[in-house]
């Protein structure tokens, strides 16, 4: 289930992080896809490997006195390693009912490779994108 995906994407050394943009919170993380269970990987078409990274983005709209709600968004992402090589990451939407919307993408990584991620997020109904930037180092076995 998606709850399993959510749990797996927020564990380990790659703790979930977020940035606030007005009424919206963008949650993001990246981890080795080998940390995802076989069942979850199969259900969502994720290739499990120490040399594959998974990036996960979700967008929540915050409303006073109400729990945050997941919203659809246009999400584009790229990753640049420390030698300056940039890779576009193909993001795809994963939904479960109206309660959970995630955007996931994959890229190949090498041991101790560090990436600077740049993610452009435009929530549905908004015209200005939010720019989320973060750095992540990956370890392979």
Question: What is the meaning of each model-derived region?
Answer:
Residues 92-118:
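Short, solvent-exposed, Trp/other aromatic-anchored flexible loops in extracytoplasmic proteins
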């Amino acid at each position: 289930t998606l709850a399993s995906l959510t749990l797996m994407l927020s564990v380990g050394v790659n703790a979930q992080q977020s940035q606030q943009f007005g009424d919206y919170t963008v949650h993001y993380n990246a981890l080795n896809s080998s940390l995802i269970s076989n069942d979850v990987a199969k259900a969502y078409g994720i290739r499990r490997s120490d040399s594959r990274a998974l990036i996960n983005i979700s967008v929540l709209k915050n409303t006073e006195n109400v729990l945050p709600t997941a919203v659809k968004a246009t999400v584009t992402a790229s990753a640049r390693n420390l030698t300056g090589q940039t890779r576009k990451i193909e993001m795809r939407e994963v939904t479960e009912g109206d309660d959970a919307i995630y955007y996931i993408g994959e890229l190949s990584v090498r041991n101790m490779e560090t990436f600077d991620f740049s993610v452009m997020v435009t929530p549905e109904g908004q015209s200005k994108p939010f720019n989320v930037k973060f750095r992540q180092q990956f370890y392979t076995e």
